[in-house]
Amino acid sequence: MDLTPREKDKLQIFTAGLLAERRKARGLRLNYPEAVALITCAILEGARDGNTVAELMSEGRKVLTRADVMEGVPEMIPDIQVEATFPDGTKLVTVHNPIV
């Protein structure tokens, strides 16, 4: 399988997001990389589903709460920026304070 570097990055994000989702489902509190991966994955999948940038900026704040992550993680993530592919092209989605 020949994948571009961008496609490889997306697969790594998806894999990390899937791992984070499983750990969250088991009741584990997520660390920094897991939290970022899960939110990023949700944004990428939302873009693939046809949601708008504005919708994803809002939905990105609903993926995790403080109770879902380890202490100090929300303060480590002031914002997340994801370059996502939409039906009309690639756009940058910025989610400010993604964990509230």
From Swiss-Prot:
Pathway(s) where this gene product acts: Nitrogen metabolism; urea degradation; CO(2) and NH(3) from urea (urease route): step 1/1
Signal peptide interval: none
Root EC class: hydrolase
EC numbers: 3.5.1.5
A GO molecular-function annotation: nickel cation binding
Keyword Cytoplasm: yes
Substrates-to-products reaction catalysed: urea + 2 H2O + H(+) = hydrogencarbonate + 2 NH4(+)
InterPro entries referenced in this protein's UniProt entry, alphabetically: Urease_gamma, Urease_gamma/gamma-beta_su, Urease_gamma_sf, Urease_subunit
Record Pfam families: Urease_gamma (PF00547)
A GO cellular-component term linked to this record: cytoplasm
Keywords: Cytoplasm, Hydrolase
GO term, biological process aspect, one: urea catabolic process
UniProt subcellular location: Cytoplasm
Main subcellular location of this protein, as a coarse class: cytoplasm
Subunit: Heterotrimer of UreA (gamma), UreB (beta) and UreC (alpha) subunits. Three heterotrimers associate to form the active enzyme.
Family: Belongs to the urease gamma subunit family.
Cited PANTHER family: UREASE (PTHR33569:SF1)
Alphabetized HAMAP family for the sequence: Urease_gamma (MF_00739)
Protein name: Urease subunit gamma
Organism: Nitrosospira multiformis (strain ATCC 25196 / NCIMB 11849 / C 71)
Gene expressing this chain: ureA
